[in-house]
C-alpha cells in the first residue's frame, strides 16, 4: 500500500500555481520525484536561472515533464491566462493552488484580486475542465485573533469575524470559497504550514538574517515565545497527503489543516542559532527590546501610515507575530491526512542553516556587506 502523500502524485497531471516561489517550486520537484507525469507551473514571476536549472535536473532524473507558464501566461488576475493553463493537457488530475500575494505591504484591492478573485478563477476552471481535486494552500494567520496559540487543534480555531491583516482576511475568503465549492465532482481541502523554511527561502529567514547582519535586530520582549515551524519538504508532503485524502466521504473534505515539523521551538533561540552560524553578533549579547515600547512604536507607525499612506515595516501585526506563542496540534492532520513529518526540526533546521551559510552568506557579503555584522 502506498505511503501517505505518495499515491496521488503517481502518473498524475497537476497544476501548481505559485510555481516560481519558495514552496511552489519545491512542490513541482517533489511531485515529479514521486512519479507525476506532467506538472504545469503557473506563476506571474518567471523562474530565475537557478530555478530553471533545478527544473531541468528533476526532469532528467525522473522522466517527468514541467510546463512553465510565467509572466502574462501565469497571471492569476487574467481570466484567459488561468483558463489557458487548464488546456495544456487533455485531463488535469489535481490543482495545487499555492500562489498568493503575501506580506503586509499591499492595498486591499490587490490582495482581493489575487488571493480571493484569483482563487475563484481556479475554482471556476476546475469545474469547467472537470478537475476532480483542488488542494488550497491556506495560512494559520486566517485564525489569529491576537492572542497566544498554544497547542490548539484546527477545530478549536474558527475563522474570526475580524482579522489582524489584509493578507489573512483575503486568504480566509479564498479558503471559504474553496470549501464551499467542494462536491462529488470537485473534492477540496485546505492545508497550511506554520513558518515554512528551508533552502531557497527568500522571505522568512533571509530577511531576519539581513537585519541581524546589519546589526539592527534585537530580541523582542523576553524572547521565550514558542512556535511551530515547517520545513518546506514537510509542507509539500502535507499538501500531497491532502490530495491523497480527497475521496468521497473523506473526513478531510472542505476542511482546514495545519502541518509542521512536530514539537514547538523557541523562536528566538533557533533564529539566534542561524545568526551565530553566519558569523553575526549573538543576539543574547545585546539588550532586549521591551514589548510595550515596541507596541507603542508600532502603533505610531500605523498612525503614520494612516495619515500619509506610506507603509512602514514595523506595525502592530509584525510585532505581535514576533512575540506571541504560535504552535499547533498535529492531531487532526495525523488522523485525517495520515501526515507525519519527513524530517524533524532537529534534522531540518541545521540543514537549512548550512545551506544558507554556503549559498546565501557569500552572496550577501558580495553585495557590500562584508564589513557588517
Residue spans of the language-model regions?
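Conserved C-terminal active-site "lid" loop/helix of NAD(P)H-dependent oxidoreductases
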Residues: 232, 239, 299-340
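Amphipathic terminal alpha-helices
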Residues: 2-7, 13, 328-336, 340, ...
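Catalytic helix-loop patch of NAD(P)-dependent Rossmann-fold dehydrogenases
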Residues: 113, 148-196, 217-220, 225
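N-terminal Rossmann/SDR dinucleotide-binding element
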Residues: 1-94
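Mid/C-terminal beta-alpha module of Rossmann-like enzyme folds, strongest
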Residues: 245-313, 350-351, 363-373
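NAD(P)H-binding glycine-rich loop region in Rossmannoid oxidoreductase-like domains
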Residues: 62-117, 121, 125-128, 142-146
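Substrate-positioning beta->alpha
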Residues: 169, 173-174, 201-207, 221-245, ...
